[in-house]
Amino acid sequence: MTRKIDIFDTTLRDGEQSPGASMNTEEKLIVAQQLLRMHVDVIEAGFPISSPGDFRSVQEIGRLAGDDAVVVGLTRAVDKDIDRAAEALSCAKRPRIHTGLGVSPQHLADKLRISEDECVERAIRCVRYAKRYVEDVQFYAEDAGRADQGFLERVIQAVIEAGATVVNIPDTTGYQMPAAFGARIKGLCDNVRGIENVTIAVHTHNDLGMATALALAGVENGATQIECTINGLGERAGNTALEEVVMALRMHGDELDGHTDVVTQELTRASRLVSRITGMQVQANKAIVGANAFAHSSGIHQDGVLKSRGTYEIIDPADVGAAGSEIILSARSGHAALRHRLSELGYSFPESEFDDVYQRFLEIADQKKEVFDEDLESMVQERQRDVTAIYALESVQVVCGDAAIPTATVHITDEVGGEHVVACTGTGPVDAAYKAIDKVVSVHGDLQEFAVKAITRGIDAIGEVTVRIVAGDGRLYTGRGSDTDIVVSSAKAYVNAINRMIQTTRSKQGK
């Protein structure tokens, strides 16, 4: 069994420090509910002394979490900060005070203006002071990534002896290389007495784009808590992305000797929730949760994925709550991808015709970055409009109005010359016409989409109706019809879709 790696989420504290990403208490509670749904181990709910809003957030999230997660309030190594955090956490069942100070030469000389000895004294004092309120005290050695290793070990030794239960080793500026950061954690494990009895946490930033690699290097060398945020939100270039470390541990748990209890199927939902609340858009190519994370546009890749998802996807989209793989059609797409998408839209062509269809597709793709469904439908419209009519709509007559029950009478001929005249009522003239058509045809499709657009100008414009129906096997079939009368257009489109459905069924049966 691999080690349990605790996920410490700081979206509501460090993540909120992203410019423009601030959240009010109600929004923080919504995010906290999602974190609890994901089974995150620790939630850093805020910095209580910084504002009344942060104080209330820590208080409310402490109540909300119950026994399901540790709730953390951040402080400086200052008594009044710790007092305020303890007050905010008084309702939490599993409270933790997170206190500390800088330990790098830059922080000691330029920010704190204290000596190493004074730093050690403050570290001991803040831990002891926090222990008066709670048993669970986490100490952060800010900017540990640039600290002298010997001095860092001295500080960590001192706070463990003072009663710290968690020691947080941040690379606050994202400065370190992964191997060097891992060696730093290993040095602590080798040289600090009693460190095996506390939790070693890593808090890494993304200034050089290596936050996830740094965090995993820490885990490889003894850390058992990762501090991270949804979507990698945070100061400057952000923090370690929760979704990235969780999935890395899922994929490489044996190598890293670690696993998490996070419900990975909630990752995409969490990403979208935080993006919506903060207004911080997720880049399309963001690992795990980006819009393009499971999108394929290269023809070679598309062909491979269509044959077997595992050829180019190491993660099943369902495992992170994503809708599924997506084939992006462009000039780089091949025959397989085009045929697959056309099939999904309800279009099929024999081999003898498909090369012509593909060449027309390339002409369109050369003019556009991405070819959408509407482009494909327009592309095949001329060919498919002339589809052999199994049923032909001869006429439609409707009666409707404020005082009338909508009624449609359709006249349809079939492929063997039979004539059918049927009348039906409905909730409107189009519904009545569709019910009448259903009584005539031999198959039935459920209407999924109905769209109308004018394809010419003026009050006598021709209206084009596009419908999509779903057959019993789940396949989509598209139909189009145009006329100056929108009810006639609608009926034509429906019959067109029905004809396509029947043709495809017959083709499968070899008829």
From Swiss-Prot:
Record-linked SUPFAM superfamilies: 2-isopropylmalate synthase LeuA, allosteric (dimerisation) domain, Aldolase
Functional pathway: Amino-acid biosynthesis; L-leucine biosynthesis; L-leucine from 3-methyl-2-oxobutanoate: step 1/4
EC number annotated for this UniProt entry: 2.3.3.13
Reaction(s) catalysed (UniProt annotation): 3-methyl-2-oxobutanoate + acetyl-CoA + H2O = (2S)-2-isopropylmalate + CoA + H(+)
InterPro entries per the UniProt record, alphabetical: 2-IPM_HCS-like, 2-isopropylmalate_synth_dimer, AIPM/Hcit_synth_CS, Aldolase_TIM, LeuA/HCS_post-cat, LeuA_allosteric_dom_sf, LeuA_bact_synth, PYR_CT
Gene Ontology cellular-component annotations: cytoplasm
Top-rank lineage group of the source organism: Bacteria
Keywords carried by this UniProt record: Amino-acid biosynthesis, Branched-chain amino acid biosynthesis, Cytoplasm, Leucine biosynthesis, Manganese, Metal-binding, Transferase
Basic and acidic residues: compositionally biased ranges: 1-16
Region (Regulatory domain): 392-511
Gene Ontology BP term (one): L-leucine biosynthetic process
Alphabetized GO MF terms: 2-isopropylmalate synthase activity; acetyl-CoA C-acetyltransferase activity; manganese ion binding
Chain segments carrying region Disordered: 1-23
Localization (cell): Cytoplasm
SUBUNIT field: Homodimer.
Function text: Catalyzes the condensation of the acetyl group of acetyl-CoA with 3-methyl-2-oxobutanoate (2-ketoisovalerate) to form 3-carboxy-3-hydroxy-4-methylpentanoate (2-isopropylmalate).
The protein's name in its UniProt record: 2-isopropylmalate synthase
